Amino acid sequence: RQDEPLILSSASGYQLNPKLHIMTDYQRFDELVSSAVRASSVINKVDILKNALDLYHGKVLSSADGEHWLIQFSTKYHLSYMGAVSELLKQLDSLHSYDLLNQYAMKSLTIAPDNPKAYCWLIRSLKAQGMNELATNELAAAKEHLTTEEYEEILAFGANW
């Protein structure tokens, strides 16, 4: 299929040539997140979500961030990523898998420092491990990165620590 063009142009815009059966990381991410919802066990769900999150490295085409044609697509995947992270962290907490929880929470906060749920699960995990000073440091970081309302949400969640 070397004679097939990679990108097709139409009246509605550009698209990857469907005859080439190309799957992007973002399509694979969507597929994995959907599979995680249907997973039969917590362990399967965790494995699938880890695979999905390992594909996500930040906003789609960040060099074109703010372009009107990209905003809806980029926002959809960013919100889907934050939802998948929150679900993975919740499942890891239920398994008391704190090392993995810490790892994925920290990675997610480098990609999306505006995710209050990642802070919640990370702080909860650190406290569960007796790492109170680190938990306090993360709470301070959350206060810097989040809105007042989001920060108060973390404090309310903290009543369960």
Give each language-model segment a name.
Residues 6-161:
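Intrinsically disordered, charged and Pro/Gly-enriched terminal/linker segments
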